């Protein structure tokens, strides 16, 4: 899988939705508290970006697997798996690698901060996966966008402030 296919699979242009609250929280903490923790910033950045890309790839993969009509309505152009003739194995490999990176960097962030990050991380990862996947995905429910807005708008913003202010690292 080439870089262009990967970027289309993870819909890189949509990552602004998760990066905006992350960067806003960081700018706020810089302005209000004059604090910035490079290590925590980078750990959360990588974890957040990898997880966002993984959930988008999962969504595209499930759309590909569940497609009833595979022609028309721009399906051939909009689904990267079809457009670039990506193998299921390569798509699943990308998803697994992104999830491993997201979890790994998330655990490192938790170890560098506090259990609050772990608890919110577990809840956020669960909602992110269940948003697209499961017997009844959250996105198909009437309150799907409320869940999305709460986690993308509040939890990411809160954590992006919290990681810079928390001084009680579990691992020193």
Enumerate the language-model features and the residues they cover:
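Cytosolic-side membrane-entry/anchor segment at the start of a transmembrane helix
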Residues: 1-21, 131-144
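Generic hydrophobic alpha-helical membrane-span motif
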Residues: 17-19, 58, 69, 93-94, ...
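Membrane-embedded alpha-helical segments that form the functional core of polytopic membrane enzymes
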Residues: 22-24, 28-61, 118-129, 169-172
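Membrane-water interface at transmembrane helix exits
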Residues: 25, 29, 33, 59, ...
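Aspartate-rich (DDxxD/NDxxD/DxxxD) Mg2+/diphosphate-binding motifs
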Residues: 51, 55-99
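Intramembrane alpha-helical segments
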Residues: 79-168
